[in-house]
């Protein structure tokens, strides 16, 4: 939360926290206030599960394994692979043909990302890719995938990477 809040939150909009366990509430509020986010209007009791159980409408992102991603690449499917890792991670190796935009820069680089074509989000293990995918969905991208395990799983599967 302390690292990612600045990438996705706005100081001029109310914040509703979604926490699986209320014991994390005080710490989350403290982190946000220290970062200058003080318009915290409440929290969702019961977390996401409570939201589901109440019958409210939800959205979700699709998940891909690295094997499914590799199959899409091999079939030549139209797909943007968006790697949102840091520059040093990218330089150590990435999927050939992937586009690199650091997760914190995605909101300001939306014009570089096709909203009407599939995008597979990729990072080191999937956490930042999930955040990046959420940003893309919020910004109107229609078909967004979070690649489970991302680079860690890609390497474990023995799939090729490049440093070019």
Model-flagged regions — what are they?
Residues 1-80, 84-164:
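Rhodanese-like catalytic fold shared by cysteine-dependent sulfurtransferases
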């Amino acid at each position: 939360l302390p690292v990612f809040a600045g990438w996705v939150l706005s100081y001029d909009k109310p914040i509703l926290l979604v926490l699986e366990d209320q014991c994390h509430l005080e710490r989350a509020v403290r982190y946000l206030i220290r970062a200058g986010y003080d318009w915290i209007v409440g929290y969702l009791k019961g977390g996401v599960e409570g939201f589901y159980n109440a019958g409210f409408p939800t959205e979700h992102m699709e998940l891909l394994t690295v094997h499914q991603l590799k199959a899409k690449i091999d079939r030549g499917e139209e797909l943007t692979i968006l790697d949102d890792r840091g520059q040093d991670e990218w330089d150590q190796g990435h999927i050939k043909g992937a586009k690199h935009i650091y997760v914190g820069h995605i909101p300001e680089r939306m014009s570089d990302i096709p909203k009407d074509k599939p995008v597979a989000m990729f990072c080191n293990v999937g956490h930042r890719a999930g955040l990046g995918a959420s940003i893309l969905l919020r910004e109107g991208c229609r078909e967004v995938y979070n690649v489970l395990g991302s680079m860690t799983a890609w390497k474990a599967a023995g799939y090729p990477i490049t440093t070019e």
